[in-house]
């Protein structure tokens, strides 16, 4: 039980360090940036396999992989996701004992593809294990686009 609570606390710490900004629409060489919101206060269920696809389009599928990590305070509730109007892109990394953050950089649309760029920042070895997770929320209008992930390590 302590391990689960500690993993939830670490997930919240990681998501708190993630950018809270929403990307805006701009034109750049045939691509348009897509607005997204970072979902907070969710944890990956440890009895699940890492999803093969980063795209989750239904609440049922989302709830299969993620649980709510409600904490006290003003920003303690999980970010609301309306799957009738939105879908999510998730990045779930394997369990590690190295401090790891996943930071969304941008999402761009070009033709029928979404290019999701994110950074993975690794730090010091820890005495405990975490499972790094990042969830971003996008408008349903992009749901049918093919998703291509672009990872940057720092």
State the predicted function of each range:
Residues 56, 60-115:
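Mature extracytoplasmic domains of secretory-pathway proteins
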Residues 94-154:
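Extracytoplasmic electrostatic interaction patches
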Residues 13-16:
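C-terminal motif of bacterial Sec signal peptides marking the signal peptidase cleavage site
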Residues 1, 28-30, 41-42, 91-96, ...:
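Intrinsically disordered, low-complexity segments enriched in polar/charged residues with Gly/Pro
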Residues 18-21:
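Bacterial signal peptide processing site
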Residues 23-81:
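Acidic/polar, low-complexity intrinsically disordered N-terminal segments immediately downstream
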Residues 2-7:
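Sec-dependent signal peptide recognition
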């Amino acid at each position: 039980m302590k391990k689960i609570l500690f993993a939830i606390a670490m997930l919240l710490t990681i998501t708190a360090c993630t950018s809270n900004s929403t990307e805006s629409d701009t034109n750049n060489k045939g691509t348009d940036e897509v607005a997204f919101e970072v979902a907070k206060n969710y944890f990956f269920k440890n009895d699940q396999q890492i999803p093969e696809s980063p795209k989750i389009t239904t609440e049922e599928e989302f709830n299969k992989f993620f649980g709510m990590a409600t904490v006290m305070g003003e920003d303690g509730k999980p970010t609301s996701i309306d799957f009738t109007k939105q879908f999510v892109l998730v990045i779930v990394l394997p369990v590690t004992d190295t401090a790891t953050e996943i930071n969304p950089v941008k999402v761009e649309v070009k033709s029928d593809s979404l290019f999701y760029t994110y950074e993975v920042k690794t730090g010091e070895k820890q005495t405990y294990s975490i499972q790094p997770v990042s969830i971003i929320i996008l408008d349903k209008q992009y749901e049918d686009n093919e998703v291509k992930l672009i990872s940057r390590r720092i």
